[in-house]
Each structure stands twice: as structure tokens, then as C-alpha cells.
UniProtKB/Swiss-Prot annotation:
Mg(2+) binds at T16, D51, E112. Keywords: ATP-binding, Biotin biosynthesis, Cytoplasm, Ligase, Magnesium, Metal-binding, Nucleotide-binding. This is ATP-dependent dethiobiotin synthetase BioD. Homodimer. One of its GO terms (molecular function) is magnesium ion binding. It is found in: Cytoplasm.
Length: 242
């Protein structure tokens, strides 16, 4: 299997935009990439304002929203609590089953978690437990400004302590007026974590188009580095299957 697990230092940091944009760029490059966000709270999957619909729109996948996100609920709470309050039970086994179903359509998947790695996810797992099952390299999406060094370094350390590989960090929501501080934060994150910051994605104000987001991803994210990871994963998977 190949792809990336997109996580973050917090909620509302920009995971969905990053995941959808990267998938869209890779699909334009000819890769058979799909997107998967097993659990979503705050919107049902079909809601155009929700993450599943935005993933579909940005990535350009033919997959239906309720297949991108098989478990969704309106209440904006941690997924485990939201499902419990709605009287629904979702287990780690359930979301892995749907992951394997998506792999029947695509060679690689970009998987988006919920919030950060320690978020209560299914009834029996945190987000990090799901990431450990998939063993995909992580992309950590983080805020660009004050507090991000601490949050990002802690997230990376937590991931590494659980045996996960962190491919890189993307700082999302960068404003031109803050770029001096953003660059300083980038350097500190790399020095303290040993993980590269692969992109400084701009802040998108108001309504934005798929074209704007994908063009920004191509300009501000090191797509070639991520492409190298995908190729290496595919080579390892092919070698292991022989």
C-alpha cells in the first residue's frame, strides 16, 4: 500500500485543503490516487460545506462522498463522542474495512484523520492507532504562527514514539505580512524535530477555486519530495509482494 496519512497539530488547521490539494496535484500527474476520511463530525458527508465534499471537489476523484467518508454526523465533537451521543458504534475494524474497499479502486490513498493524533476516534481507538494500522508516512499540517513550534514538535515526537514515519510538515494559512515569523518557525521546527517543512501554503481568504488551491500547492509545496516518497513506497510494496 502507498499514500500518506494527513494529520495535524489541532483541528481547523487546514488538513482537508492540504489532503485534497495534494491528491488533486498527484492525479494531474497521472497517479491513481484516492482520498479517504473515515470519520467526520460537524457535517454529514453529503453536505457541500463538509470535509468529504471538499476532498472530492479538490481531488477530482469519482468516489461518492459517503464512500470517501462512510461515518459522518452533524454534531461538531470528537468523533468517538459524536458517534456515542448519536447511538452509533464504529470500530477500528470498521474503518480499516472501508480503507481496503477504497484500495480496490486506487493504487494509493491520501487518508485524512480528525484533529490531531491523540483525538478519541473510533470506540476502541485514537487517531494514532488507525495511523499505526495503515503504516503510511505522515504529513503533519500545522499553523504557521505563534505556538506552532511547540505543537508541531510534540506531534512529531508522539508519532515517532509510536513507530511512525513523518515525511514532512506543511505550514498552512501563511500570510504575506507574517512571513518573517513563519520562516523563523520553519527553521526551528526543522532543527528541533529533524523533519523537513515541505511547504508554506498561503492563506485562502473567502471563496476559493480548485484551480487556485492546486496551483498554490504546486508553487509552495515540494511536490517532488512527496512524489519520491510515493515511488519509494510503491517499490517496497512491489518487492515485498514478489
Amino acid at each position: 500500500m502507498s499514500g500518506f496519512f494527513i494529520t495535524a497539530t489541532d483541528t481547523e488547521v487546514g488538513k482537508t485543503v492540504v489532503a485534497g490539494a495534494l491528491a488533486g496535484v498527484f492525479r494531474e500527474l497521472g497517479y491513481n490516487i484516492g482520498v479517504y476520511k473515515p470519520l467526520q463530525s460537524g457535517h454529514v458527508a453529503s453536505n457541500p460545506e463538509g470535509d468529504a465534499a471538499r476532498l472530492k471537489a479538490l481531488s477530482g476523484v469519482p468516489t461518492k462522498e459517503d464512500e470517501i467518508c462512510p461515518y459522518s454526523i452533524e454534531e461538531p465533537l470528537a468523533p468517538r463522542l459524536a458517534m456515542k451521543r448519536a447511538g452509533r458504534t464504529v470500530t477500528l475494524k470498521d474503518i480499516i474495512h472501508h480503507y481496503n474497499e477504497r484500495l480496490k479502486e486506487f493504487n494509493s490513498l491520501f487518508v485524512e484523520g480528525a484533529g490531531g493524533l491523540a483525538v478519541p476516534y473510533t470506540e476502541d481507538a485514537l487517531v494514532i492507532d488507525f495511523a499505526k494500522e495503515l503504516q503510511l508516512p505522515l504529513i503533519v499540517v500545522a499553523r504557521p504562527t505563534l505556538g506552532t513550534v511547540n505543537h508541531t514538535v510534540l506531534t512529531i515526537a508522539y508519532a515517532k514514539a509510536h513507530g511512525l514515519t513523518v515525511a514532512g510538515v506543511i505550514l498552512s494559512g501563511c500570510k504575506e505580512c507574517e512571513m518573517e515569523r513563519v520562516q523563523e518557525n520553519k527553521v526551528m521546527i526543522e532543527e528541533l524535530s529533524g523533519v523537513p517543512v515541505l511547504g508554506l501554503l498561503p492563506f485562502f481568504e473567502g471563496e476559493f477555486t480548485k484551480k487556485e488551491v492546486l496551483e498554490s500547492a504546486k508553487e509552495y509545496i515540494m511536490i517532488s519530495k512527496l512524489e519520491e516518497c510515493i515511488r519509494n513506497e510503491s517499490t517496497v510494496a512491489h518487492t515485498s509482494s514478489n
